[in-house]
Amino acid sequence: MKGRKRTALVDVLGLVLKCHVGAANQADVKAAPWVVFAILESNERMSKVLADQGYQGDLEEDVEAVYEVIFEVVTHEGKEFSVQAKRWIVERTWAWLDNNRALTRDYERLPENHEGMVYAAMIRLMLRRLENNRRTWKKEKP
């Protein structure tokens, strides 16, 4: 495999719920079922999935019919740049993950190992955030 493409489903905080690593020449629509269906089968509380224009078509219809979840494809009008709603959350997650050296280079032979590295990087990031947000108690000086 010459290159890899990561497809991920994140929550509103930008935390990775499910990740799939496939060939770089694989279209987004082909990789999305690995991610979307796996999460929707295990998470009954999810009511809405936001996606960009690369996920239009049969996937949208299948998700809404089978799982009764709103699958909203965010589109932009015109040729000018415009900020897409909630798109920055996913891009921010990719930026967080790109800070990990193990993910910037392709060290693994198997895509499954790369997925594991994505999850490990996300766990490390979440633990670091929990540690930085803990309350520190000041000791009183005698």
What are these regions (language model features)?
Residues 23, 75-80:
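Short, acidic/turn-prone active-site loops that include or flank metal/cofactor-
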Residues 57-61, 66, 80-142:
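Basic, amphipathic alpha-helical segments enriched in Lys/Arg and hydrophobic/aromatic residues
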